[in-house]
Amino acid sequence: MSLSITLVIVVISGIISYQGFNNRSFFDRLKHYPVAEENSKEYYRMLTSGFLHGSWMHLIINMYVLLQFGEIIEYRFVDLFGNMGRIIYVLFYLTAIVIADIPTYLKHKDNPSFSSIGASGAVSAVVFAFIMYYPLQGLTFIFFPFFAIPAIILGIGYLIYSSWASEKGRDNLDHLAHFTGAVYGVLFAIVSNPSIIQSFADQIMGAF
């Protein structure tokens, strides 16, 4: 049985993140740093930063979520597009990394104190593509495995929080990238499979 593309992404992310943990110069060259992207045209950072993480916990959480949802979307694309499905999935994931970073690039291109790393924007895109296909699927939290919430409810809450935190938050998380990635996941799901709109609506209406 061949490895899933999702698992390959997890392995590559783990290798690159581990290198970043142990080599600060490597880390600094690959991180999302809008000032360098603007002044030195190092736009590659908006892609490479998606394979870096700041800690083992950061890496593990992102890759755990990606494995939970990514393989489902990957195989859904294979069902829809045949042999092209995995290629489309790779393009989806890679473009999600970049798209999620564009707003923070525009916001912080003159701010030398801002930088970010992590796959969270792309992972958000994958999760929200899942929500478009399975809006009523019960989702649980790692620490509360017996309490399930419909995916659409969690998704709405995530968007509201990410929007608020991108303006008011005082932590070091790139909430704007999370929000942008989530929106991109919805749009990609619709553009790649327009019939999903009717399926989504039918599932929501069927719940009432």
Model-predicted segments: where are they?
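A detector for small-residue-rich transmembrane helices and their helix-helix packing motifs
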Residues: 1-208
